[in-house]
């Protein structure tokens, strides 16, 4: 059985957002992102699959950009959807722990600056 406790084993990094793979199968992956205040998971998109984020601890902002930027606050208990092919980013206001589930392979493209 695959299982993970993302709260007991917090893995923050000072220089960047830390992405830790928790569980992976042929069709699905679950990762956890550990953010220090001010860290950003920059705009990117997944052309082959939706991505769902679940907030465990902390505060931040989740933004989508599909021609018009829309942002929503993140706090414990919140879940948000990044639809297939839509640019999305996360900004941490405080230490933030967010897990995500995505189909595999979903592909990944960074947004040009």
What are these regions (language model features)?
Residues 1-31, 42, 75, 111-113:
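A short, N-terminal "cap"/entry segment at the start of jelly-roll beta-barrel domains
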Residues 31-47:
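Conserved short histidine dyad/triad with adjacent acidic residue
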Residues 32, 62-64, 98-100:
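Short hydrophobic/aromatic-rich beta-strand segments that constitute the beta-sheet cores
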Residues 35, 47-62:
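Short, conserved beta-strand element in jelly-roll/cupin
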Residues 40-42, 58-63, 79:
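Short beta-strand segments in beta-sandwich/barrel cores
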Residues 68-84:
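Short acidic-glycine-tyrosine-enriched beta hairpin
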Residues 75, 84-109:
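Ligand-binding loop in jelly-roll beta-barrel domains
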